[in-house]
Amino acid sequence: MSLLKRIAPQLIALALLVALVTVFYPGFLKLDLSGGRLVGPMIDVLKRGAPVALLAVGMTLVIATRGIDLSVGTTMAICGAVAAWAVAGGWGLVPALLLALAAGALAGLWNGLLVAVVGIQPFVATLILMTMGRGIAQLITEGRILTFNHAGFAFLGSGTLLGLPVPAWLWLACGLGMAALMRRTALGLLVEAIGINRRASALAGVNATVLLIAVYVVSGLCAALAGIVVTADIRGADANNAGLWLELDAILAVVIGGNSLLGGRFSIIASLLGALIIQTIDTGILLAGFPSEYNLVIKAGLVLVILVLQSPRIAGEWRLWRDSHRASREARAAQRSRT
């Protein structure tokens, strides 16, 4: 299946959603150039959608192995706290970033060992870190919002590069780079093999344990990068709210992308489109002026419609109707030609 055909439902859903938002807020597609940077609601979608898009990259790989990572939100909080603590302590930008990424990799390694070596169910294994992770972040920040004043670090969250927000470049580079790595090498097939049948893949010579651990480490690194972006944007680490419930949006982005929670075949590009759909819904509801208490209800309703339209059964019924309609039309044309 070609990439364009694979992501066609997500592209159509995104286009329809943008059209719907434009009805309520006509200036949604408007772009202006101010101070060398593009500004507008769509640019805001690209920037604000960065955390969920980054989380969705790692979550796609985890779900492809028939797993789940509920700890990505708290990993964001931990890594953001580590980065802010290091920068505020005078470590410098590069050491602070490396320390935050190392914390994310360590969190992923912890999850991977529990799942692949100890044999704990992914839901339970990652729930452990989800439960205690925010407490770890609060210990690092000493229960307060840890602020810093470092222009280089803040650039990662609120800076502009070639007219676009830096966070947008980060999730595009991460997502497209990982997608290319998975499809241009055998890694993608190996990940899918584990998700389809881990035991069979091991018997075929795949080191399923090491690869499974690596997938969770990648998820931790993606969460660390998301935590860095959020922390840099607000110039501070908020252990209580950073990444709060974003693991659910990340899972939803993967599902909207048409990836099965039962593992197997996956598409990172489709998951990125799923993240854009979620952020477009959030931004559209805000700009349309709906009362805040209706936001979650409207969001849930729109997501439900998108998922129903993308469901295999609906797609099958549509293809059946299309084929029967085409056959009927051809039969009528043939009958007219004979007469």
What are these regions (language model features)?
Residues 32, 118, 122-184, 211-214, ...:
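Transmembrane helix-bundle core of multi-pass membrane transporters
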Residues 1-23, 177, 196, 203-210, ...:
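Cytosolic-side transmembrane-helix boundaries in multi-pass membrane proteins
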Residues 21-22, 26, 38-89, 113-120, ...:
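Single transmembrane alpha-helix segments in multi-pass membrane proteins
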Residues 27-44, 137-140, 160, 182-183, ...:
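Inter-helical junctions in multi-pass inner-membrane proteins, predominant
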Residues 92-100, 106-111, 115, 163-238:
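Helix-loop-helix "hairpin" substructures at the membrane interface of multi-pass membrane proteins
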Residues 1-5, 63-68, 88, 105-148, ...:
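Short loop segments and helix-boundary regions at transmembrane helix junctions
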Residues 1-54, 90-95, 335-339:
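Membrane-interfacial amphipathic/re-entrant helices at transmembrane-helix boundaries
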Residues 223, 234, 238-300:
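Transmembrane alpha-helical segments in multi-pass inner-membrane proteins
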